[in-house]
Regions:
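Short solvent-exposed beta->alpha transition segments
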Residues: 36-38, 52-105
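Short, low-complexity N-terminal intrinsically disordered segments enriched in polar/charged residues
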Residues: 12, 20-50
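Exposed beta-sheet edge and beta->alpha loop/turn motif
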Residues: 93-144
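Second-shell loop/turn segments in exported
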Residues: 28-29, 40-43, 57-64, 113-115
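N-terminal secretory signal peptides that target proteins for export/translocation
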Residues: 1-5
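N-terminal export leaders
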Residues: 6-14
Length: 144
């Protein structure tokens, strides 16, 4: 087989491979993107001071760990001194099926580089769990 014919046959194969790799990467990113979108929506509740509503939207594992009234009180004590949100950007997102102290499942740990009116630099960590209803729900929230 001559070189021109080999290139003519290899070209479409290479092109199809190049098109499939980004599609596979997009498919792998899909759970992480959905989890980040859900975390963003949940954080909007927290930013608006709707702490009870944020508890309502949390994962069952989260609700087992802390009652609604205790969550509202704890979040009020942590978030109020920080002041209003100035900026928030996703710093990292990591998919895992195992977390310390949690049952095996599908999780995405999202870290945000955040700035508040009274705290210039903070790291917010929102752990999302894929729950029985097929939705990503918060199973952990930490501010550092």
């Amino acid at each position: 087989m001559n070189t021109a014919r080999r290139l003519a046959l290899a070209g479409p194969l290479l092109l199809s491979w190049l098109l499939l790799v980004p599609a596979a990467t997009r498919a792998e990113d899909a759970p992480e993107k959905a989890a980040v979108a859900a975390a963003d929506a949940w954080l909007k509740l927290v930013d608006a001071g709707k702490y009870g509503a944020s508890w309502d939207e949390a994962a069952p594992l989260f609700k087992k760990a802390i009652g609604r009234a205790d969550w509202e009180k704890a979040l009020e004590g942590v978030r109020s001194p920080l002041g209003g949100l100035v900026s928030r950007k996703v710093a990292s997102r990591t998919y895992t099926e195992s977390l310390p102290g949690a049952p095996d499942g599908k999780y995405v740990v999202v870290q945000y580089a955040t700035s508040f009116a009274n705290k210039g630099t903070a790291t917010e960590t929102v752990t999302q769990a894929l729950v029985g209803d097929g939705r990503w729900r918060v199973s952990g929230y930490f501010i550092k």
